[in-house]
């Protein structure tokens, strides 16, 4: 006769790895060409001047300068630009 209750099974206990999304360089920071500014899913931030966009919607600097965030347009879209020094 068992003196301990048998262990139950569970369907929990899994989680996906964090993807490290978000803003990597903030407004006013100096960046070099090629630096990643924002990692995102979809275009929460849009590419402004001197910015490139990767196939996974990553925004990166195309030239050296300072990062500038701005909201513009009738839909109040957030744009990220690089202002040359």
Curated annotation (Swiss-Prot):
HAMAP family, alphabetized: Ribosomal_bL27
NCBIfam families tied to this protein: L27
GO molecular-function terms, A-Z: structural constituent of ribosome
Family, similarity comment: Belongs to the bacterial ribosomal protein bL27 family.
The organism of origin for this protein: Colwellia psychrerythraea (strain 34H / ATCC BAA-681)
Keywords on record: Ribonucleoprotein, Ribosomal protein
Protein name: Large ribosomal subunit protein bL27
Alphabetized SUPFAM superfamilies for the sequence: Ribosomal L27 protein-like
Region (Disordered): 1-20
InterPro entries: Ribosomal_bL27, Ribosomal_bL27_CS
Entry GO terms, CC: cytosolic large ribosomal subunit
Domain of life of the native organism: Bacteria
One of the GO BP terms on file: translation
Gene3D superfamilies membership: 2.40.50.100
């Amino acid at each position: 006769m068992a003196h301990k209750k048998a262990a139950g099974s569970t369907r929990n206990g899994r989680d996906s790895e964090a993807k490290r999304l978000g803003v990597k360089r903030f407004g006013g920071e100096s960046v070099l060409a090629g630096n990643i500014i924002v990692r995102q899913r979809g275009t929460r931030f849009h590419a402004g001047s001197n910015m490139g966009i990767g196939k996974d919607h990553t925004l990166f600097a195309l030239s050296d300068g300072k990062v500038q965030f701005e909201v513009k347009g009738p839909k109040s879209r957030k744009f990220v630009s690089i202002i040359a020094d």
